[in-house]
């Protein structure tokens, strides 16, 4: 049986920062659970859980579960400075019509 050769399939590339080993010994389970709980309490909005995220990343670096990196390189300050805009009102009983927000600006 012959298979067609698909030239659009690309070879997988490794992550930019190298491997991200699993925490088999649960060395960072407490900060990880604190971060996951924070996400759960904040509807998955990570900007409210940055301190927990920092602690988790620091734990991983301290336990050689990831390469040491300056915390400034993770973009936490950019997130703090970002303007937060409310999500548009959504009523599940109303139909969605494309282009309404553009029409209001014109």
Swiss-Prot record:
GO terms for cellular component: cytosol; mitochondrial intermembrane space. It comes from the Eukaryota. Residues 1-11 have a biased composition (Polar residues). A motif (Cx9C motif 1) lies at residues 28-38. GO terms for biological process: mitochondrial cytochrome c oxidase assembly. The keyword Disulfide bond applies. Disulfide bonds join 28-59, 38-49. It is found in: Cytoplasm, Cytosol. Keywords: Cytoplasm, Disulfide bond. The keyword Cytoplasm applies. Residues 1-24 are annotated as: Disordered. A motif (Cx9C motif 2) lies at residues 49-59. InterPro entries: COX19 (IPR051383), Cys_alpha_HP_mot_SF (IPR009069). Residues 25-67 form the CHCH domain. Belongs to the COX19 family. May be required for the assembly of mitochondrial cytochrome c oxidase. This is Cytochrome c oxidase assembly protein COX19. The gene is cox19.
């Amino acid at each position: 049986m012959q298979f067609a050769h698909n030239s659009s399939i690309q070879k997988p590339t490794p992550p930019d920062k190298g491997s991200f080993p699993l925490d088999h010994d649960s060395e960072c389970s407490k900060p990880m659970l604190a971060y996951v709980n924070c996400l759960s309490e904040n509807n998955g909005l990570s900007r409210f859980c940055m301190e927990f995220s920092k602690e988790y990343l620091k734990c991983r670096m301290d336990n050689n579960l990831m390469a040491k990196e300056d915390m400034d390189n993770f973009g936490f300050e950019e997130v703090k400075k970002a303007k937060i805009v409310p999500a548009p009102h959504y009523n599940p009983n109303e139909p969605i019509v494309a282009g309404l927000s553009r029409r209001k600006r014109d």
